[in-house]
Amino acid sequence: MERFVDAAPGVRLWAEERGAPDAPVLLLVMGAQASGLGWPDELVELLAVRHRVIRYDHRDTGRSTASFDEQPYPLTALAEDAVAVLDAFGVERAHVVGMSMGGMLTQLLVADHPERLLSAAVIGTNALSSTPYVAPDGHRIPPEELPGVSPELMELWSRPVEDRGPEAELERRVEHWRVLGGDLIPFDAVYARELERRTIAHTGHHHAGTAHARADYSGMERTEQLAATGVPTMITSAPAEPVAPAPHAEHLAQVIRGARLVEIPGMGHALPREVHAPLAAAILDHTGRN
């Protein structure tokens, strides 16, 4: 079932739910400039076997309000949007899974709205904490000194985004997914192209968005709250991760109280078919414990 959620004055978000209406709710929070369709249907269906799954379009993505140029917002507003989605669906508490920027938003929910979470799962992001990473040899490394985005991805991101028509934009996105996926799972360009065709059809246009890259990222640190949280949290470790490479997942597991670290074999910073089953199994195991 689809609906629109009034998240804030002048802001409406597209949202969809699948699964049994009386099942525990699982809220999926996607990354920057990604609509709810960033969660592939096949993965959503695996999760909906045991959950009432809700996915939604962030502001300035998909069918949601696109108004950043007129109404700039801080990234923290997107975390409050997630709470508004839960409210609109009448959900008091939910399991929350966030990927990439959505993983940052999930950390904000863990820190600022723990009473709304049954559990949290964080995929492919860095910690919102200033606590140093403790390496296996005991060496303490400040977060800002941990490895960053891969050179190939940085080069791709540095290219100007120009509107050269829908087919050129489609191919740009496919190339982006190739690099994001890493080098351990063979890249399926046909599958990536089909996912992006669905996304473009859902959005109604092919234009690339930049709002989330331009949003205010200040005020995000939650060192003390994450260290003291009681929200059961799972961190996924992806061996081919090019955005937040090792040891970012390990760092997250250290700074979030009681967090568990689970590796998804072959995974990078994308959701190809090959990771659907192991990722769904890890998420369902985690939610089943909580």
Residue ranges and their predicted role:
Residues T76-A94:
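Conserved acidic catalytic loop of the alpha/beta-hydrolase fold
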Residues T229, I235-S237:
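Short beta-strand/loop motif that positions the catalytic acidic residue
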Residues G258-N290:
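Catalytic active-site module of serine/aspartate enzymes centered on a nucleophile-bearing elbow/loop
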Residues E145-E224, V231, H251:
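Alpha/beta-hydrolase
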Residues A7-A66, Q71:
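Conserved HGGG/HGGXW glycine-rich cap/lid loop of the alpha/beta-hydrolase fold
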Residues P242-H248:
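Conserved alpha/beta-hydrolase "acid-adjacent" motif
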Residues A120-D163:
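Flexible "cap/lid" loop of the alpha/beta hydrolase fold
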Residues E92-P136:
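Conserved hydrolase catalytic core segment
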